[in-house]
């Protein structure tokens, strides 16, 4: 419910901007990352997005912290032919166990069968400045065929306890039509690594 409330807030705040644009089709996505964390609470991290032309709206839950939601508005840029790039600067509000404002970004760079993807945000905690933090998730992947990819992944998060400031690992992913499934294996040299299963749908 909090995730839906996040998206509703963003939609309400941007109603005027949407109607001021040319008539373009909405594009939506919904995804959930399920974290299996050693000696800690397992949890799901859902995200929904809505894009219309340059406008980008996004809502997340359990991303910055558990039992915490965030709502985002951003602007889509893209370009290139052989070297294709996309960049979405964003600004969001965070509320729940953590209350903050956060500038952020999402971006990708693609060439041949290689892709670099990164998303990040600087969370400025409105209660305790010492709790402010930079969150990041980055991937570099190779797709030998259209439906399969593998590569490396890193993340920096405070959603759960970890001895590592930057966690790193391996990933594999498959896609079929509008469905995308990924598996992430963080800190493979630990006795008990962290696993993440991601399922996403574009519509």
Q: What does each model-found stretch correspond to?
A:
Residues 42-53, 68-87, 101-118, 132-146, ...:
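Feature captures outer-membrane beta-barrel proteins of Gram-negative bacteria and organelles
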Residues 26-36, 48, 52-64, 71, ...:
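Transmembrane beta-strand segments that form the barrel wall of outer-membrane beta-barrel proteins
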Residues 127-131:
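Acidic pyrophosphate-coordinating catalytic loop
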Residues 1-25, 203:
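Cleavable N-terminal export/targeting peptides
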Residues 18, 31, 35, 138-141, ...:
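Intrinsic disorder/low-complexity detector
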């Amino acid at each position: 419910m909090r995730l839906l409330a996040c998206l509703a807030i963003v939609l309400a705040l941007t109603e005027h901007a949407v109607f001021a644009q040319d008539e373009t089709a909405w594009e939506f996505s919904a995804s959930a990352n399920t974290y299996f964390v050693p000696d800690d609470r397992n949890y799901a991290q859902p995200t929904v997005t809505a894009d219309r032309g340059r406008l980008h709206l996004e809502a997340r839950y359990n991303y910055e912290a558990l039992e915490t939601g965030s709502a985002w508005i951003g602007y889509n840029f893209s370009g290139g032919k052989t070297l294709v790039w996309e960049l979405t600067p964003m600004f969001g509000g965070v509320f729940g166990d953590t209350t903050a404002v956060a500038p952020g970004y999402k971006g990708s760079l693609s060439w041949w069968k290689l892709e670099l993807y990164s998303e990040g945000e600087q969370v400025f905690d409105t209660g305790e400045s010492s709790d402010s933090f930079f969150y990041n998730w980055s991937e570099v992947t190779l797709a030998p065929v259209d439906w399969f990819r593998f590569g490396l992944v890193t993340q920096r998060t405070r959603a759960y306890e970890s001895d590592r400031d930057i966690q790193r690992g391996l990933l594999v992913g498959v896609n079929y039509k509008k469905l995308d499934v990924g598996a992430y294996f963080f800190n493979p040299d630990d006795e008990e690594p962290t696993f993440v299963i991601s399922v996403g749908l574009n519509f």
